[in-house]
Amino acid sequence: MNYKKWIGVMMVALCATANATLYNSGFANGGVIPDGNVAGWSDTRTVSGLTAIADVSINIQLSGGFNGDLYGYLSHNNVLIPLINRVGVTAGNAFGSSGSGFNVTLSDSGSGGDVHFYGSGFASGNYTADGRNIDPASSPGSFDVAPGSRLTFASTFGGMDPNGTWTLFFADMSGGGGPSTLSSWDLEITPVPEPTNVALGCFAFLFASVQCVRWWRRKAHSEKTA
């Protein structure tokens, strides 16, 4: 068997990991987050057929209102992670960001850092979740938290059973800025690979590695004796 076939086997081994599953169904109540109404808006999706959670990420697209007024969380199995919690609010800025709208992907590896400090204007890009597990009506200084005290997707959902309902909630905590409208949200869940698949992948990789070494040794020997 030549080296191209060994490469093929190795590719199979490397691909023997769990694939992420994307959930992006429709919205309740048109996605309108009423202005100054702490009862807010929510949408629930049902997940089934997955193994334990390895990773979670979420994309949120919304327009209108003031970003600094918004509080939003993702919940599952009676636990939640604040995704957006009055972005921009600090001891020195009681009102937070005056920007309007989000098109952000939130994950533990978000390259833009903490979405709470995304800046001004329309928010876009990849960020980590706000993670400030405090009442959104807290005093402005309460939002100045140490990075290590923020919740992450891993600390909130890691290792849990993903099957069942997932709820996205948003509320506008301060009236006057107008309603916000959520146009879409995508939930992506990466499950832990099943043990059988991991074992097969490791075996295939080891087998391919050994055969590659043998092939190179035979090739080197034939060149010496040629």
Regions found by a protein language model. Name each.
Residues 1-7, 216:
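Bacterial N-terminal signal peptides that target proteins for export
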Residues 6, 22-27, 224-225:
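Enriched but not universal
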Residues 15, 104, 115-118, 202, ...:
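Generic recognition of cysteine residues
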Residues 16-20:
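Sec/Tat signal peptide C-region and signal peptidase I cleavage site
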Residues 21-191:
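Loop and turn regions of beta-sandwich accessory domains that flank beta-strands and are enriched
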Residues 194-214:
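A short, hydrophobic C-terminal helix/tail in secreted or cell-surface proteins
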Residues 209-226:
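C-terminal membrane-anchoring or membrane-association module
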